[in-house]
């Protein structure tokens, strides 16, 4: 019987600080290095924030921002281009082609006034929605959104696994 004695692949990073000492804009910029496209998650979002003239909101106001990544934004623009093509319209090739007011409206859907951490958001379980419905929050733009933490299962034990936030628009309030 043998075992692996080489554990050089193990790297103990120690405890990480869950708090970021900076503004939301600074955080987004730190995750969008110009010289490293592979690790660029938010450059499109940063451009949209600037086009919508919302930098001040994310730098100075006390808000929670559910930041869409480049992938999400590009996927949305691709879907919009498909719909526009079917209607006989030209494709969007540059984010500047969309009016700043439209960007502001859509960005506002992802911003909540006040700061919330995971412990401030109630549980949601889509298989037991009556027991764990999440909570309605009103966005920066005035829209009702249901927000809840989904507690994953681990090793067959309910609610002890990884957590993720479910964020969805409420149509009929």
Language-model segments: what does each one mean?
Residues 2-173:
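Mature, structured domains of secreted/extracytosolic soluble proteins
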């Amino acid at each position: 019987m043998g075992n692996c004695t080489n554990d050089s692949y193990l790297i103990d990073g120690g405890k990480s600080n869950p708090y970021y000492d900076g503004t939301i804009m600074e955080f987004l910029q730190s995750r969008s290095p110009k010289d490293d496209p592979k690790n660029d998650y938010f450059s499109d979002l940063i451009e949209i924030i600037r086009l919508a003239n919302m930098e001040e909101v994310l730098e100075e106001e006390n808000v929670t921002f559910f930041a869409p990544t480049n992938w999400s934004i590009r996927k949305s623009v691709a879907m919009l281009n498909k719909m526009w093509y079917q209607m006989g319209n030209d494709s969007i090739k540059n984010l500047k082609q969309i009016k700043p007011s439209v960007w502001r409206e859509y960005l506002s859907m992802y911003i909540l006034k006040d700061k919330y951490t995971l412990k401030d958001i109630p549980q949601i379980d889509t298989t037991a929605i009556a027991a764990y419905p999440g909570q309605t929050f009103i966005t920066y733009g005035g829209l009702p959104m249901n927000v809840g933490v989904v507690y994953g299962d681990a090793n067959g034990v309910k609610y002890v696994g990884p957590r993720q936030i479910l964020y969805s628009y409420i149509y009929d309030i």
